[in-house]
Amino acid sequence: METKLDPVVRQLADHLSFLGYEAEEREGKNHPYLYLRHQRNPNFMIDTFLGAVKCTVYWGLSPEGLAGSLEMFTLLNELNRQALGFNIYTDEDSLILELVIPREYSKASFGAFWSVVESDFRLVMDGRLGPFLS
């Protein structure tokens, strides 16, 4: 079966599989994307958008998160200051982490880049956001 998955996204999937991620190709509105799972890290999507490759994590918001408290937004501002790769924000019902992945793939540079991504995952998953997530 021939895939329409972006070749760079395919390379990233192969690399992430080596790091313990399970990649599943899914059909999006306009083109396929990857959905990735890991035992210790959040599930996320890798997709293309306007020629860029992006990684997106979605978490549902709890009733406290949906209320949009000053405490939550203060914490999000703090996390955005500390995060090295992700932009962290909310929409109507989700907390979203989003970053652009370099299109030029090399094993060494992507490995270093991904260690920054996993550092941001740990930062966000440290428990402080717990009351705001469903």
Question: What does each of the following model-derived ranges do?
Answer:
Residues 37-66:
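Long, continuous compositionally biased terminal/linker segments
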Residues 30-34, 53, 95:
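Hydrophobic residues embedded in beta-strands of well-ordered beta-sheets
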Residues 56-96:
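Short, internal acidic amphipathic alpha-helical interface segments
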Residues 1-43, 81-90:
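Charge-rich, low-complexity N-terminal segments
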Residues 113-121:
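Short amphipathic C-terminal alpha-helix that caps PH/PH-like domains
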Residues 18, 125-134:
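Charge-rich, low-complexity terminal tails
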Residues 85-113, 126-130:
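Well-ordered alpha/beta subsegment
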Residues 5, 9, 65-69, 110:
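Generic alpha-helical secondary structure
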